[in-house]
């Protein structure tokens, strides 16, 4: 795939959805961090249902700590791996208060030092909460990048690095959201909706329909 085709792909994504964003509901960097921590192996819909009850009660590190672990788990128990995730949330809140005055740091190294926060989670927060042009690669983006040949790679980091290198700079801020939405609703794992795909003619997937 060449530079001109990638340019056209993202031109089309932008024309169809000029202001893409996450489907997780949040109103602060802290709320986004908690939502992303809960979202591993869970749906955004499921996370939003839990945080719709949790955030009105506790949406700061201190308020979460005041709830206590059992209190937090009452709100997160509908989500997979909720016990581990809730412990990570409690530990993260303590660190945010002790080291960062209760604020979420806008720095990758600091974010990745928090319990349960890996590179992907850090990138989501940096991009969505702080407007940094970074690329969080999840299962949807990994699939789309490889299937279309926008940025084929054997592992998540290779795909991330290629996307950062290949995507025209003007699209980098929103590319994560366009690709994840495309993978979630059009370029699905088992039944890709090729007939409805706005980049069908540009895609290099051999089995496209």
Language-model features and meaning:
Residues 2-209:
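Catalytic cores of DNA base-excision repair glycosylases
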């Amino acid at each position: 795939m060449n530079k001109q085709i990638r340019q056209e792909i993202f031109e089309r994504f932008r024309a169809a959805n000029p202001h893409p964003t996450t489907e997780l509901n949040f109103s602060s960097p802290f709320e986004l961090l908690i939502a992303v921590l809960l979202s591993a192996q869970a749906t955004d819909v499921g996370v939003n249902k839990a945080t719709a009850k949790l955030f009105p009660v506790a949406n700061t590190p201190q308020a979460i700590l005041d709830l206590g672990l059992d209190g937090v788990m009452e709100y997160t128990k509908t989500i997979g791996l909720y016990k581990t995730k809730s412990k990570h949330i409690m530990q993260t809140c303590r660190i945010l208060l002790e080291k960062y005055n209760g604020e979420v740091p806008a720095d990758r190294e600091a974010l990745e030092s928090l319990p349960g926060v890996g590179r992907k989670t850090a990138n989501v927060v940096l991009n969505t909460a702080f407007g940094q042009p970074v690329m969080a690669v999840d299962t949807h983006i990994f699939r789309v990048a490889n299937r279309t040949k926008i940025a084929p790679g054997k592992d998540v980091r290779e795909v991330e690095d290629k996307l950062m290198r290949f995507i025209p700079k003007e699209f980098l801020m929103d590319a994560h959201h366009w690709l994840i939405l495309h993978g979630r609703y059009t370029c699905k794992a088992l039944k890709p909706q090729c007939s409805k795909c706005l980049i069908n003619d540009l895609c290099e997937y051999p089995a496209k329909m």
